[in-house]
Amino acid sequence: EFALFKGHRYATVVADADTQQVLWVGEGRSRAAFRPFFTWLGPEGCAAIESVAMDMNTAFDLEVREHCPQAQVVYDLFHVVAKFGREVIDRVRVDQANQLRDNPKSRQVIKRSRWLLLRNPENLPAGHDVRLSELLEANQPLNTVYVMKTALKELWYAPTEQEASQRWNDWYRQSQES
């Protein structure tokens, strides 16, 4: 999906991942907006779909599962890492800040660290890498979730399905232990 205008009117693009050919474009990102693609494709076309890569839009997910139940759904790296950041890193950061109510200076450092923790290291402004290192050295729970975020990204770069599966199992085990 992509924004058509600044006012957040969206369009949905369906492309063949093998050929990179655009197959269909529709206005909107709701189930109703996406459904005409499956009508156009027909039952035989839907049955031929093996996998679908998409963002974590619930409407897309529900439509794909309804029309192509055999298809493997793969969520894109950006949205998975963003969700991990919102739901895990932010939760740990807020919890850590709340534990420091008696130390306002340290609490403020953690409260103001959101973007430092969520940004990719290569996108940090000059000098912020030192701040990040100091923060992670001083706070083990934040360090743990930051390392887990980095390892989560590596799942998408596995050279083989077997390696991806092994990385997933390792990541999941580590997440349960931390």
Predicted feature descriptions by range:
Residues 10-13, 85-96:
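Short, surface-exposed amphipathic charged segments that create phosphate/polyanion-binding patches used
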Residues 5-8, 16-20, 27, 35-36, ...:
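Acidic/histidine-rich catalytic cores and adjacent linkers
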Residues 70-86:
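Inter-helix linker motif
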